[in-house]
Amino acid sequence: MLHLAILMFCVFSITTGEFVVAGILPEVASDLGVSVGSAGLLVTAYAAGMIVGGPVLTALTTGIDRKRLMQALLAVAIAGNAVSALAPGFSPLLAARVVTALVTSTFFAQAIVLTVRSAPPERAATMVARLAFGMNLAMILGAPIGTQIGGQWGWRATFAAIAGACLLGLGLVSWRLTSPGRDGRSSAVSELRVLGRAPVLMALAITAVGNVGVLMVFSYLAPLLTELGGHPSARLPILLLTYGLGATFGNLIGGVLYDRNPRLFQPALLGLLAAALVAGWSVATSSALTVVAVAVLGFFGFAILPGMQARVMATAAEAPTLAMAVNASGYQVAAACAGLFGGLIADSSAGPRPLYLVAAALTACGLVLTVLATRASRAPDSEEAVATAN
């Protein structure tokens, strides 16, 4: 369990750097003499770095010992955040953020594979959920603390603190993490071939389609809660914390449920998420009920993730690391599409309320794909057969 705690802390440290930027954008913009909109490119560039760079870097580092690779990735994260803290202008800061983004999904993919392979196959989703708890903590603790540090000592202190946390993570990995060697990994070309299989492509599609709806609502929670729900802007941090707490419990419980019966619970969780989105639409103008809706959406929005990640790993058993990196990119693509198309809906004459129904419909599409994939997995080339063969 110690190695899991170490990896969880490393994930917490790295992903805090991803989530915290939104909270310090005004300070960055003011200090570097750019508009808040221009400073927002830090978020866009980071996402682009994860989408493109994560899979490429993972493919290029296929043959490297996992422990040494994770040490190198943490070193890059330390350097990227340190350069961010010392950046003399916006362009160097933007470049440093892109470099840091390159290692985020690669490290998470390595950590997931290492964690899952240290546990019995029937506990794969549970282990993924426990590791992802570090990401949940980054959302509900790391980002607020980093924002507070930025408000107290300046945004540069925020990046310096993240660099320090990554440095501590590097020390812990070097001290206690056991190197598994190459653990039977194949070449990059062989792993790319694995990603072309129909079950793998279906699993990746489920991640993208199944998440875009809830991400659309999350991206526009502020107008949904203030314009429709009647909440004052000052209450938004508390409501976001409510979402984060729901997400934390959903992530942990979703992993346990998937391991107990993936054929039953993964479709059920997606169906309940779609129903929760419809319920969110129906109570959108009630201040009290929207608080409950936010917590429920956070719960089911994250309860579906461990099972999705476990399915990707099972269908791509010969290339789990690259598959997880591509899966993370798929999630980021879903987030980008959610922001883009959600904005079009929110700016329409109907206002933001239809976001709930559009999100429910998209989630239902993810449910359909999951049911189809579950039925197909009963064939001899199913994900279970692949997992058993390995």
Regions found by a protein language model. Name each.
Residues 315-350, 359:
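A late C-terminal transmembrane helix in Major Facilitator Superfamily
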